[in-house]
Amino acid sequence: VVVSDGFSLVKTDAEGVFSLETTDRSRFITLYTPTGYRHTTPFYVDIREGVPSSVSFGLVGADDYTGQFIQMSDIEERTYLDWMDDFKSYMEIKKVDFVAMTGDICYAPGLQLTGSEFNTDDVGVRMVYTLGNHDLIKGYKDSQGRDYGEKPYEDQFGPVWYSFNIKGVHYMVTPMLIGDATPSYTPDDVYNWMRKDLESIPEGTPVVIFNHGVLGNTEHLVLKTDTQTLDLSEYHIIGYIYGHNHVNYHYVNKNGVQMICTIAPNKGGNDHSPSSWRLFTADGEKLTNELHYYPIPKQMAATGRVVGG
């Protein structure tokens, strides 16, 4: 089982024991969910106030995973509204493995609302969040005096990058690199972790990446900085799922990666798409999806015109 502080990755021994050396930039120790298991404790430990001498995680075997998950994006919600109750009601009858909320939860009020009213316990299924550009908040510094725009997000949801595994598929959660405030991390930090994480899984493992936007470009997914190039085509990426653009969009790039953008479930899209979320099914190397539109009020309207006199 892989354990990480976001910078280094180590694997436990057969008994689940591990040793991890942290840095002054480490904020969380995270257990990357192995296939066939479910957490009985939080999947991360907050070490921002200090590193404990020992850390324990709980796992239990689980054979009821469906391979299905839901994505929504850009909810930008500050007030608890009816659509949230409607979605929770839907989740009572639709069994999925997790819900991915891909960014722009939106500013401190939105982060606080979602963290308190739209979390794993409230929705009844694991909630997976990614950090969007409007989730970086000004006015925060870390202990080293660096800009720390991701702090309010971390206070609610924990680490901004990590991975987990379900039914043989490897899911990577990654953050937006820029936004309304400056984060303490750099593109190199994110890309270094992505490289280590991808190299920690067996070759050929299908991978799905979540982000609020697109790292690199939709055609090639080649991630570059002044010091490195990370070509995601060298790995078995089957899906890249994001939001940010406020449109429903599904495109297969030249490397065969499905690029899938989804609008908000509470206000529709810039392309005039009605409010919706997306239901995915991951079956080995096959990733399919379908849109589910927000329930339309049961109202009828008619128009007509008078012909002749």
Question: Which residues make up each language-model segment?
Answer:
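Short, acidic Ser/Thr/Gly-rich low-complexity loop/linker segments typical of extracellular
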Residues: 2-17, 21
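Active-site glycine-centered loops adjacent to acidic/histidine catalytic or metal-binding residues
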Residues: 74, 103-104, 132-133, 212, ...
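A short C-terminal boundary segment appended to hydrolase-like catalytic domains
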Residues: 281-309
